[in-house]
Amino acid sequence: LLSFMLTHKEKTFTQRQLAEELDLSLGTVNILLKKLKEEKWVDEELHLTELGQKILEPYRVKNAIIMAAGMSSRFAPLSYEIPKGLLQVKGERLIEREIRQLQEAGIEDITVIVGYLQEKMFYLAEKFGVKIVVNNDYYKYNNCSSLMLVKNQLSNTYICSSDNYFVENPFEQYIYRGYYSTIFAEGQTDEYCAIEDSNHTIIDIQIGGENTWAMVGHVYFDRAFSEKFKEVLETEFKHEPYREQLWEDYYSRYVKELLLEARHYSADIVKEFDSLDELRQFDERYLVNADSAIIDNICKTLKCVASDIVNIKPLKDGLTNTSFSFDCLGKKYVYRHPGRGTENYIDRASEAASMEIAAKLKIDHTFVAMNKDEGWKISEFIPNAKQLDYDNWDDVTQAMDLLRRLHQSGEKTEHSFDQFEGIIDFREKLKARNRF
């Protein structure tokens, strides 16, 4: 009530209007206002006094942390080209909209943690006056590693994801207690779900559920939560296996000590897009133009339009590439996207020439196209595919038959490869990238 009155200090409200605005009964508002007047926190005209503003001060939001380091691999293929937070939705970049909403709520101390494609995020510092922290471990650890970098900033702090879209501004300048935003998931969900008591305090967390409150969106750490959570974070992060977990996993193990409210929001207000198909349902522009070179590559190769490309599913990453499957015009395909920096140690032109020969000899029946300059490839999808089992003689025999057919074909390319020199060269390049 005090926070509402401060936010709307230029206006005068009746008790009935306050009850409607705050979704409280008229009787409850009457009792609260009587108490506030007795304490001299509001005056007879129901305006906040100087003492009332002082009482609010411990509940003022100090800062916000925006998590933007992850690769968002589920959001293929757009996340292969730009960080998910830089996607434009309804004409605004996700992270820019979030920063503006925080600043409109009076929160100026904002830190953005970057990692994957970090250089594309650096402009935010100059444009919005935010601080940038780089997480160089983004590719091997989970978001707990990001919080470790800013643990000393945790206080009365918003923890935000760069890829949420808030239809209405959910941020406030004063908050009574810490909370995790939740939306009601109709049917099955694989999100983390909050189990709460009658006061909406989260008392347990389960992964996945049905017709339940899913933990989606922003989080607010109050000062008491932050002090305890910092201890938990430092303790848990010492264990190497735990570094691959979400900070929510740490929280769930100490949920009885780390108190947060489950704050309920409408799914029409808090949006999280886990796939291009979901984004298309909210922003129809992506049906026509996804602003993606990858989508353009597919359209040109398969003679289709962007809306024909559906059911995109990330596949397990290879050693040097990232791939996803998709449906297009009644057939299923795989798009292979070259990993960053692989052009330094993989000769894509040589690979493309070999691929074309394998297709010509009917050794590879799936090959559709490969770009020898950029390294991307499109193939037909093979259901129930398996890797070669070197201990299975039937597998080895089939593989050797294919290799024999290739080497006895007489086909040649203009490329050559010395495997021993190649191994030495590969090792040196990995060392130079601190990946060996």
Where are these predicted regions, by residue range?
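Active-site catalytic-loop/activation-segment of kinase and kinase-like phosphoryl-transfer enzymes
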Residues: D277, D283-R285, A293-I294, D418-F436
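N-terminal glycine-rich phosphate-binding loop and ensuing alpha1 helix
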Residues: S3-L6, E21-L22, K54-Q118
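Conserved beta-loop-beta/alpha segment of the NTase-like Rossmann-fold superfamily
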Residues: E119-Y192
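ATP-binding pocket architecture of kinase catalytic cores
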Residues: K313-D418, K429, R435
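Conserved core of the sugar-phosphate nucleotidyltransferase
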Residues: V42, V167-Y242
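Short amphipathic alpha-helical interaction segments
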Residues: D23-K35
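A short, conserved structural fragment
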Residues: K37-L46
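Conserved alpha/beta core of the MobA/IspD/sugar-nucleotide pyrophosphorylase nucleotidyltransferase superfamily
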Residues: H47, L51-A64, A214-K300
